[in-house]
């Protein structure tokens, strides 16, 4: 039996149009976070890229009138947050995202602020080596600016007590995390300079995320460190954590414990150095006395050996020895020269060059033939690949669509016209053809009523 009502039959164009309308009307604008990849910017100024996460990706476009409001240059691998409309490109049936706005997501925004401040302060020469103050050697009093409850303070005090128990330490407690932390750190630095009790300051905290360490990327903290008359050692986080404070400080220590090592004297090491110096001095004195005694003995012996009869006897013996060596060397030289002449004569007779020349010429001819064959084959393959690539590029080029007689019309706001209700009489329109643009004014609007076929 036939069903009472046949299912609706869609053309491909109608199907794509229906899906596009469903996406645009049902979804509306959405916020999407993801990682940028395959970013390109053709001559039109539009941006084309892919947003992806661990399991999926979607193609995106951001037109020139929208991307000119973005305050940063998107980079491959950057995490971003976009506000976009979901649509379908009807000619190809491709689902894509039209991005209206973009901003860095999460730590990407913090990293961007970090780089901007770093570039700004570097341009003002706050990082230059010429402004770095030398640390006192030795330090007579150490100031520590950090949290009074943090592990960093415990580590610093532990190292100072172990290395230099007599070194005075003054603690300027401050918050190192949160919105109020930068202001407190600045006030602590200024207070230390006003009281002028210390000759070196340690400013830092323990490790954490980029957000946790952000107080030490604050411009106010950086300028306070730069303005400090007392030398500042930065000790923020772990060795891999680098903050703006590290660049401005007079010295950067990889950890708070390392900062304490830098500013303190190791008393045990000093004692070992004194003992070592004493031992070296004693050894030097012993060596000097032994050397003087040995020198005196040598001079005394040389005086005894310089008798004229002894000198004549030694010279006579040496002359006879040299005569024997000269005769023996001359005989050996003549013998070796004769043997060498015989070997050269034999080698010359054996090394007739004609056979070798013939073999080399034959080999060269074979290689020339093989090289010509390889070059012809590679040239043919390259021409074939180039032809295929040109054909493929021409097939997928958007300009090919325009060349077949199609055009794209946009309103004054840059939106592509799809229906007559998007325009009004008197508005100016821009039409893109294969070879250029046409600006026109709407004189008359005539909607076309679509006829519906009754389905039996």
UniProtKB/Swiss-Prot annotation:
What Pfam families would the database entry show?
A: Exonuc_VII_L, tRNA_anti_2
Instruction: Name the catalysed reactions.
Output: Exonucleolytic cleavage in either 5'- to 3'- or 3'- to 5'-direction to yield nucleoside 5'-phosphates
The kind of enzyme this is, by top-level EC class, is: hydrolase
Record field: transmembrane: none
Keywords assigned by UniProt, alphabetized: Cytoplasm, Exonuclease, Hydrolase, Nuclease
Q: Does the keyword NAD apply?
A: no
EC number per UniProt:
3.1.11.6
Location relative to the cell: Cytoplasm
InterPro entries membership: Exonuc_VII_L, Exonuc_VII_lsu_C, OB-fold_nuc-bd_dom
CDD domains found in the cross-reference section: ExoVII_LU_OBF
Any one Gene Ontology cellular component term annotated for this protein = cytoplasm
Q: Which biological process, per GO, is one annotated for this protein?
A: DNA catabolic process
What is the superkingdom listed in this entry's lineage? Bacteria
GO terms, molecular function:
exodeoxyribonuclease VII activity; nucleic acid binding
Assembly description: Heterooligomer composed of large and small subunits.
Q: Which family does it belong to?
A: Belongs to the XseA family.
Looking up NCBIfam families in the UniProt record yields: xseA (TIGR00237)
Q: Relate the protein's function as given in its record.
A: Bidirectionally degrades single-stranded DNA into large acid-insoluble oligonucleotides, which are then degraded further into small acid-soluble oligonucleotides.
PANTHER family noted in UniProt = EXODEOXYRIBONUCLEASE 7 LARGE SUBUNIT
The molecule here is called: Exodeoxyribonuclease 7 large subunit
Q: Which organism is it from?
A: Shigella flexneri
Taxonomically, what lineage is the organism? Bacteria, Pseudomonadati, Pseudomonadota, Gammaproteobacteria, Enterobacterales
Name of the encoding gene: xseA
